[in-house]
Design a protein with these regions (language model features):
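Glycine-rich phosphate/pyrophosphate-binding loop
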Residues: 1-5, 217
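A broadly conserved detector of short glycine/acidic/proline-rich loop/turn motifs that flank catalytic sites
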Residues: 6, 39, 137
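Conserved catalytic cores of soluble enzyme domains
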Residues: 63, 71, 75-196
Length: 217
């Protein structure tokens, strides 16, 4: 499993490097990868202090490298050869939600606040969140059904432009931030157990296993 250990579990250069290394090791040595953080927040996104300092010092190459590195890291998880599951809780904002977008499945705490909020500080999502928020909404469309894709693009743009935040895991599902099949845990103490069930039982594909355990069946 992977656990962030930065302040508020924020994203910085060391975390980005760790994500790449964790994906490689998971593919080499394990059957699945689990992202389970500790502390008050799951992940509040990028370390804005580091971003501001780099900008003030005009370290444009370093900023460019960090943005590209996190984009690649989330996509690296998305296309990993082993299933990746995240256990978001509390604040799962900006890069925290982008991290979830890179996962095959989510076992979220009911009290999860999720959204791409970068526009609030004058930025746009930098970790492939713009792409993956749209992709996640399109995933819910049944195969073969004709749709107006522009409507999905417009809604994604609104979600990002208004920094829309879901105030619960269920609302995150309703907004299309999480999949309908993603799990929700009322008790964080059970979250890790349910996470393991999802990772082992059919490598993320057995959503029924999560449902049975969450309802005590």
């Amino acid at each position: 499993g992977l656990t962030l250990r930065t302040k508020a579990n924020s994203i910085d250069a060391d975390v980005i490097k760790m994500l790449h290394e964790a994906a490689e090791r998971a593919e080499r040595d394990f059957r699945a990868m689990v992202i389970y953080n500790q502390g008050e927040f799951f992940c509040v996104g990028a370390n804005l202090f580091a971003v501001v300092m780099a900008a003030q010092q005009k370290q444009w190459d370093g900023l460019r490298e960090m943005i590209h590195g996190y984009q690649y890291a989330t996509q690296r998880l998305k296309y990993a050869k082993v299933p990746v599951i995240a256990a978001p809780y509390n604040m799962t904002l900006g890069g925290g939600l982008e991290l979830c977008y890179g996962c095959d499945g989510v076992q979220a705490a009911l009290e999860t606040y999720a959204g791409l909020v970068e526009v609030g500080v004058g930025l746009i999502p930098g970790g492939a969140g713009t792409l993956n928020m749209l992709w996640r909404s399109l995933e819910a469309v049944p195969e073969g059904v004709e749709i107006d894709t522009q409507a999905f693009v417009v809604q994604t743009f609104k979600n990002i432009a208004l920094a829309k935040v879901a105030t619960s895991a269920d609302e995150a599902k309703a907004f299309g931030f999480f999949r309908p099949t993603d799990g929700v845990s009322f008790d964080r103490a059970r979250q890790l157990h349910l996470l393991a069930v999802g990772a082992i039982g059919e490598q993320v594909g057995d959503d029924a296993a999560l449902d049975r355990h969450d309802h005590g069946l």
